[in-house]
Amino acid sequence: MLKHDYMQVSQDQPIYSEAPLQLLLFVDGRPKSRQQVQRIRAYLKELQAEYTFEVQTIDVGQQPYLAEHFKLVATPALIKIHPEPRQVLAGSNIIAQLKNWWPRWQVAVDAYLKLQEDLQEHMDDNGRGTLPKSTIHSVAVSAELIRLSDEIFRLKQEKDNLQEQLQFKDRVIAMLAHDLRNPLTAAAIAIETLQSNYNLETGEFQRLKPSMTAHLLKQARNQTKVIDRMITDLLQVGRGKDTEFPLSPQKVQLGKVFLDVLEELCDRYTAKSQEVETDIPSDLPYVYADPERIRQVLVNLLDNAIKYTPEGGKISVSGLHRTTQKVQFSIGDTGPGIPVENRDRIFENHFRLQRDEGKEGYGIGLCLCQRIIVAHYGQIWVDSAPNNGAWFHFTLPVYPS
């Protein structure tokens, strides 16, 4: 009789078999099951000396779809897939179970072979048998369908993510066209005014007082910074949350950076008659941080505070030496606050409150702030009550003395 060696099911090309008795041995990589698998293989090899059958070994780690197809809950497991009905042997006594079932399996094999002989007479005109193939082929096809189903699900998720990114980019392009117009117009007016009043021969500005010249130069500089900040924020967030965030940490006096940013945004909160209250102790320790990155955080948080605080409202800025290793900074406003159900989501990329859909912005500012603070091994969070404003807090490491 033809004897079949042990075979490993190919991960890419499952083996199709016509053997009358077909078995699948499911194994895993656990050291505890290794000895049991070796004993099962040895016993099957003894049986192969006398009987015709085929065993295919399947590593569940490499082919989980087959394990899912047979709904296996434990390994090792030995499955008779042909002739039908299918039967699963599992547990610590597989060899004992095999000895018990083997005679009945042989009876089923004899019955199958007898049926094959009887059906040899049923041939079509081209000499092809009409007996369906009941082999590992059906198992492989089912497993492949499961794998393809999982792959389709994964691709659908990727497609949804890409569509979300495309929608975000479309929204950003539309918003950029709107939001960039204001600072561009302001900068252009300031520069054109300076240019039209500049005398090349004398090298002086005509009809402009020194204070007005300084104001126009500051206006042009501030507006170009606004444009640069918009573009920088978009590029950094567009890289994705898993992208490495480069930092150049150094000794920073954050209180001074706070005051510089407040001065930069002075025109904005002054235009809304907003009061700015600062409480930054003079003995606040230096922090270990990237000044440009932290400046981005301060600009974003203060920009939001100005945007959402009504005219005549108050913005508060404070610093606190929380521990020997951390310094906490806080920015509060008297705006509408943040609903409780949205406090955990406001740091998500592209997330915006429904009430803010009509306001300028891209839903990336707080996400960017969180990425920067986390990159500094700090924390950022919000305290808020509806109609009572919001307080944003973040911590940074103290510069080691």
Swiss-Prot record:
<dbReference type="InterPro" id="IPR036097">
    <property type="entry name" value="HisK_dim/P_sf"/>
</dbReference>
<dbReference type="InterPro" id="IPR011649">
    <property type="entry name" value="KaiB_domain"/>
</dbReference>
<feature type="modified residue" description="Phosphohistidine; by autocatalysis">
    <location>
        <position position="178"/>
    </location>
</feature>
<comment type="subunit">
    <text>Homooligomerizes. Interacts with KaiC. Participates in the KaiABC clock complex, whose core is composed of a KaiC homohexamer, 6 KaiB and up to 6 KaiA dimers. SasA and KaiB(fs) compete to bind to KaiC.</text>
</comment>
<keyword id="KW-0090">Biological rhythms</keyword>
<keyword id="KW-0808">Transferase</keyword>
<keyword id="KW-0067">ATP-binding</keyword>
<feature type="domain" description="Histidine kinase">
    <location>
        <begin position="175"/>
        <end position="400"/>
    </location>
</feature>
<dbReference type="Pfam" id="PF00512">
    <property type="entry name" value="HisKA"/>
</dbReference>
<dbReference type="InterPro" id="IPR003661">
    <property type="entry name" value="HisK_dim/P_dom"/>
</dbReference>
<keyword id="KW-0418">Kinase</keyword>
<dbReference type="Pfam" id="PF07689">
    <property type="entry name" value="KaiB"/>
</dbReference>
<dbReference type="GO" id="GO:0005524">
    <property type="term" value="F:ATP binding"/>
</dbReference>
<dbReference type="InterPro" id="IPR004358">
    <property type="entry name" value="Sig_transdc_His_kin-like_C"/>
</dbReference>
<dbReference type="InterPro" id="IPR023527">
    <property type="entry name" value="Kinase_SasA"/>
</dbReference>
<dbReference type="InterPro" id="IPR036249">
    <property type="entry name" value="Thioredoxin-like_sf"/>
</dbReference>
<keyword id="KW-0902">Two-component regulatory system</keyword>
<dbReference type="GO" id="GO:0000155">
    <property type="term" value="F:phosphorelay sensor kinase activity"/>
</dbReference>
<keyword id="KW-0547">Nucleotide-binding</keyword>
<dbReference type="InterPro" id="IPR036890">
    <property type="entry name" value="HATPase_C_sf"/>
</dbReference>
<keyword id="KW-0597">Phosphoprotein</keyword>
<dbReference type="GO" id="GO:0007623">
    <property type="term" value="P:circadian rhythm"/>
</dbReference>
<dbReference type="Pfam" id="PF02518">
    <property type="entry name" value="HATPase_c"/>
</dbReference>
<comment type="function">
    <text>Member of the two-component regulatory system SasA/RpaA involved in genome-wide circadian gene expression. One of several clock output pathways. Participates in the Kai clock protein complex, the main circadian regulator in cyanobacteria, via its interaction with KaiC. KaiC enhances the autophosphorylation activity of SasA, which then transfers its phosphate group to RpaA to activate it. In addition to its output function, recruits fold-shifted KaiB (KaiB(fs)) to KaiC to cooperatively form the KaiB(6):KaiC(6) complex (independent of SasA kinase activity).</text>
</comment>
<dbReference type="InterPro" id="IPR005467">
    <property type="entry name" value="His_kinase_dom"/>
</dbReference>
<protein>
    <recommendedName>
        <fullName>Adaptive-response sensory kinase SasA</fullName>
        <ecNumber>2.7.13.3</ecNumber>
    </recommendedName>
</protein>
